[in-house]
């Protein structure tokens, strides 16, 4: 089995090294094409206004001056000798759940793999920002290999990929696995204004306390209860329950 790895934290990120160790428990044919620099929060963007620069780090290990989407495209279309059997994106430092999935470059790596016709999974490791960015990578590294082996046997429809989030706990305290839906978060988003040396304003986007209802059956609820969350996500964003209402409002009758 040929596996392509990418991430959004960059080619030197600790989570990518963790993902490589996970992947090597599944196959000895593991390739990496990851961003040269941190691309967090760039979602499913791709580079069109400048060239992509590819650097070989070592055998089967490449850095690209581009986004996670660029990396998967280059990996599948240019770098690998043949199409991979699996794309793994991560392991992200921090959970990617609820509304976060639309911002996430980690999720985008799995989205692009899916668009390219390859089974794809995104992996993220939750941690507490109040603990000085101490990420419990051992949780993902301990449980991901067996979980991925099982998930490889799932018959996923075209356009669907899996989003895996690992809880912020010690491996011995992990409480199991839940198959979940997306939750809903209040971002607590603020805009912080500062001034540079010339007195000109600049801004930082900041997130405060992230509140939510943590409804049972959601990714947030699973992680809050020490469980691994596995969420099937699909590329088709159409809200089919609203199509007829929109069509009727426009005088078309029932939508096709």
Curated annotation (Swiss-Prot):
This is 5'-nucleotidase SurE. SUPFAM superfamilies: SurE-like. Gene3D superfamilies: Survival protein SurE-like phosphatase/nucleotidase. GO terms for cellular component: cytoplasm. Nucleotidase that shows phosphatase activity on nucleoside 5'-monophosphates. It comes from Agrobacterium fabrum (strain C58 / ATCC 33970) (Agrobacterium tumefaciens (strain C58)). GO terms for molecular function: 3'-nucleotidase activity; 5'-nucleotidase activity; exopolyphosphatase activity; metal ion binding; nucleotide binding. Its cofactor is a divalent metal cation. Belongs to the SurE nucleotidase family. The keyword Hydrolase applies. Binds 1 divalent metal cation per subunit. Signal peptide: none annotated. NCBIfam families: PRK00346.1-4, surE. The keyword Metal-binding applies. It is found in: Cytoplasm. It comes from the Bacteria. Its EC number is 3.1.3.5. Keywords: Cytoplasm, Hydrolase, Metal-binding, Nucleotide-binding. The lineage of its organism: Bacteria, Pseudomonadati, Pseudomonadota, Alphaproteobacteria, Hyphomicrobiales. It catalyses: a ribonucleoside 5'-phosphate + H2O = a ribonucleoside + phosphate. A divalent metal cation binds at residues 8-9, 40, 92.
């Amino acid at each position: 089995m040929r596996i392509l790895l990418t991430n959004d934290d960059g080619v030197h990120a600790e989570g990518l090294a963790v993902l490589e160790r996970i992947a090597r428990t599944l196959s000895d044919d593991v390739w990496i094409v990851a961003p040269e620099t941190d691309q967090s929060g760039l979602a499913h963007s791709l580079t069109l206004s400048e060239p992509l620069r590819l650097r070989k780090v070592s055998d089967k290990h490449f850095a690209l001056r581009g986004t996670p989407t660029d990396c998967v495209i280059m990996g599948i279309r240019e770098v690998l000798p043949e199409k991979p059997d699996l794309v793994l994106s991560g392991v992200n430092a921090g959970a990617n759940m609820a509304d976060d999935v639309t911002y996430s470059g980690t999720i985008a790596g799995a989205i692009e793999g899916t668009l390219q016709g390859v089974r794809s999974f995104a992996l993220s490791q939750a941690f507490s920002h109040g603990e000085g960015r101490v990420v419990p990578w051992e949780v993902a590294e301990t449980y991901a290999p067996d979980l991925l082996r099982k998930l490889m046997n799932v018959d996923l429809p075209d356009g669907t990929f899996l989003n895996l989030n690992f809880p912020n706990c010690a491996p011995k305290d992990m409480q199991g696995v839940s198959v979940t839906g997306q939750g809903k978060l209040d971002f607590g988003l603020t805009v912080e204004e500062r001034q540079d040396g010339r007195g000109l304003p600049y801004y930082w986007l900041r997130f405060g306390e992230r509140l939510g209802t943590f409804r049972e059956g959601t990714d947030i609820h699973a992680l809050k209860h020490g469980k691994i969350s596995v969420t099937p996500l699909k590329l088709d964003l159409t809200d089919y329950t609203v199509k007829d209402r929109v069509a009727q409002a426009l005088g078309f009758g029932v939508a096709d």
